[in-house]
Structure formats: C-alpha cells, structure tokens
C-alpha cells in the first residue's frame, strides 16, 4: 500500500518564536538568537529569513552577522550618496527606503520557552493525527503518516497540512 506523509519543518523556529513574542513578523524582521553575554564568536542559534537573504547562514557566529551587516550597510551608504539614517530591522522598510541602514535584533536564547511552544504545536497535530503516526525529528520538525486520515477528513495531504498549520 502506498503511504502519504506530511513533513513539517518550522522556518527558523527559534527566531520565529522570538519575533512572535515581540509582535513582529518572523519573515520580515531581522533577528538573530544569540547570547550577547558571550563573545562575538558565539554561535547564533537561529537567523531570521530576512537576515539570511543577505547571505548570512543559519548557524553563523555573531561576528559574521556583524561583519555582513557592515558590508551591506557600506553598499547601501554608497548607493544612497554617502548617507544612511535610522536603522531598521524590517525588510519591507529597508526595501522601500534605501536611506535606512540595516539593523537587527539580538534575542537571548530561551530554550524552556522554545520547548513549551513546541509542545503546544505538537498538541495541535494531536488534534488531527494519533501520536503513533507522528514522528518527531527535532524541536521544530515532524514527519506524519497521514495515509489513514485523508479519507476520514475527506482532504488531500496538502489540505490537511493547511488545516493543521492555520
């Protein structure tokens, strides 16, 4: 029998949690999760998608973020005729106003919170799928065998995934 699976990998999970906690859009807010009490050699636990768009890897060291943002701002300054004004952490603002400097937030890691929210998300999955059909790979990644649920819910796998994540 052919099986149908849904794979869910939450995008930049730690950074997304930090953005949501602040009422910010995780897809457009420049944010890294890192412990500033350590040196700039500390590894960022997460980098938001909008910062990754500047070529910053997901597990960068903090000094790499600092250097890359300096490079980006030097280029923005050159294009803006030598002047950059206020920093912005919002990708939309930066896209529409070339006179703004790229800024970013640094959020300290909150592992207990990430585990708590991951549990809440897992409980949403349990409303639709039995635990024996959910295979947890990490705090933000699951694979679900939904073969036996599609007929029950009269949905495709894509439709079921959309219901679970909405």
Predicted regions and their residues:
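Gly/Gly-Pro- and Ser/Thr-rich, intrinsically disordered tail segments characteristic of DNA damage-repair
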Residues: 1-166
């Amino acid at each position: 029998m052919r099986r149908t699976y849904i794979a869910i990998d939450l995008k930049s999970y730690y950074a997304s949690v930090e953005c949501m906690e602040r009422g910010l859009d995780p897809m457009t807010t420049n944010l890294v999760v890192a412990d500033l009490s350590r040196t700039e050699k500390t590894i960022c636990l997460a980098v938001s998608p909008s910062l990754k768009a500047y070529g910053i890897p997901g597990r960068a060291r903090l000094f790499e973020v600092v250097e890359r943002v300096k490079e980006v701002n030097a280029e923005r300054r050159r294009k803006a005729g030598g002047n950059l004004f206020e920093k912005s952490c919002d990708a939309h603002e930066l896209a529409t106003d070339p006179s703004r400097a790229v800024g970013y937030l640094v959020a300290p890691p909150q592992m207990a919170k990430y585990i708590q929210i991951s549990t809440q998300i897992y409980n949403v999955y349990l409303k639709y799928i039995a635990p024996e059909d959910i295979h947890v790979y990490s705090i933000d990644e699951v694979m679900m065998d939904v073969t036996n649920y599609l007929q029950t819910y009269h949905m495709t796998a894509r439709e079921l995934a959309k219901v679970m994540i909405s």
